[in-house]
Amino acid sequence: MKIVMCNGCFDLLHAGHVAHLQEARAMGDYLIVALTLDEFVNKGLGRPIYKWEQRALLLRELRCVDQVSPTTNGS
C-alpha cells in the first residue's frame, strides 16, 4: 500500500484545496492529511477562522481523504 501525506491548515477550504487533495490521493492508496493545530496556524491575526475540529470534520467528508491527524507544523 502506498501512503501519501499532505500538510496544511486548510482554513476556509476551497476548490483549490480539494483539487490538491484529489491529486495527492491519486498518487497512492491512502491519503493522510496532517492538519495544523489552531495554536500553530500562522496566517495572521484572527486565524484560523475555523477551529481544528471544524476543519477536520470538513476534510473527513471528502472522499479522497482517508485520515486526518493533528500536526504542530505551522502553515
PLM region spans:
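Nucleotidyltransferase catalytic core that binds NTPs
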Residues: 1-75
